[in-house]
Amino acid sequence: MNEVAIPSVLLDVPVPAATVHKQNLLDLDREGLEHFFADTLGEARYRAHQMMKWIHHRYVTDFDQMTDLGKALRAKLHQHAEVLVPNVVFDKPSTDGTHKWLLAMGTDGKNAIETVYIPDKGRGTLCVSSQVGCGLNCTFCSTATQGFNRNLTTAEIIGQVWVAARHLGNVPHQQRRLTNVVMMGMGEPLMNFDNVVRAMSVMRDDLGYGLASKRVTLSTSGLVPMIDRLATESDVSLAVSLHAANDALRESLVPLNKKYPIAELMESCARYLRGNKKRDSVTFEYTLMKGINDQPEHARQLARLMRQFDNAVQSKDAGKVNLIPFNPFPGTRYERSGETEIRAFQKILLDAQVLTMVRRTRGDDIDAACGQLKGQVMDRTRRQAEFRRTLEGQADRDAAA
């Protein structure tokens, strides 16, 4: 057998060490963490519970500060794991107490999302994003104008809650300033199903943020098959972006309606309620736009649809309506309905025994109101450039320090 001579120059080339993939623990719910500690680290599952408390109750991400974990375990964690939370590019308070954060997603300087905290009497609600951008092209939503970039990871979704809760000084089960989470930020949550459901599991876990299922709300534009899947995998509250009670008008506002028309959507919502006795209602969101969907006939159509829904579920107030005055953004052709039209619309619904609320506009002075989330600058290219400049400025400040 002939031997092959190896050039001496190759013998001097160092062989790179194998890169050990580190698991971001923020990507895991309780079950995932238990498996990671048992299977990867060879540790007892209760260690996962300690880790969840450090991350989500005490907001600690440095393993060396986790004092009830032994030195050997901390060494294994340093080798195999990390806790990466979103980087806060900037945060903006509103005059009404609303707070908006622009958060960096990833390390490439290309993706940033917004999350908003809305305080109210006796409650504090966090509006969480599920995607960078959105691909559903609803014509009245600012997020749609930037297009779809990618889904957020579980860590990036629950990381929004982590950032807000830490900023607020939230202490689960004690000093609770964050009482509700709504998946109503950027993106369509049901198009990022697995990551969203996993993140909502952490929100509701006593070792996470301890929120009751009814205090976590997922809002969808109407992906019928995924509503059915959600009914089997979660028991959170459901909200539907309806905005019109007839197919022709809804198709012009929510293009997804061409694939899943109103009749199919309403039946899937009825199945969602019938599948779990803990779920007693669906909230239907209706953005009021001047001269588009705010006329008395539109209100009467919506009232009929809600009565039909109650009958299908065989429960009074199974369908609740949340009227949302349109929040303008640069470049939109729509206008907000006047106060007179809004009250007249609500009165028709109330007279028809439909439980109806008007959402008070919050955070519009910082572009944090419903439908306004998209980033600080108008288009994706400019948004990314602004984001990179912000990070470079921070790096320069760190270097000078």
UniProtKB/Swiss-Prot annotation:
Binding site for S-adenosyl-L-methionine: G187, E188, S219, S241, L242, H243, N327
Cofactor, free-text remark: Binds 1 [4Fe-4S] cluster. The cluster is coordinated with 3 cysteines and an exchangeable S-adenosyl-L-methionine.
GO cellular component, one term: cytoplasm
Catalytic machinery residues: E114, C370
Enzyme kind, highest EC tier: transferase
Binding site for [4Fe-4S] cluster: C134, C138, C141
Sequence ranges assigned to domain Radical SAM core in this UniProt record: 120-365
Covalent S-S links between cysteines: C127-C370
Location(s), subcellular: Cytoplasm
GO MF annotation, one: tRNA binding
Reaction(s) this enzyme catalyzes, per UniProt: adenosine(2503) in 23S rRNA + 2 reduced [2Fe-2S]-[ferredoxin] + 2 S-adenosyl-L-methionine = 2-methyladenosine(2503) in 23S rRNA + 5'-deoxyadenosine + L-methionine + 2 oxidized [2Fe-2S]-[ferredoxin] + S-adenosyl-L-homocysteine; adenosine(37) in tRNA + 2 reduced [2Fe-2S]-[ferredoxin] + 2 S-adenosyl-L-methionine = 2-methyladenosine(37) in tRNA + 5'-deoxyadenosine + L-methionine + 2 oxidized [2Fe-2S]-[ferredoxin] + S-adenosyl-L-homocysteine
Record-listed E.C. numbers: 2.1.1.192
Family: Belongs to the radical SAM superfamily. RlmN family.
Note: Reaction proceeds by a ping-pong mechanism involving intermediate methylation of a conserved cysteine residue.
This protein's name: Dual-specificity RNA methyltransferase RlmN
Species whose genome carries this gene: Xanthomonas campestris pv. campestris (strain B100)
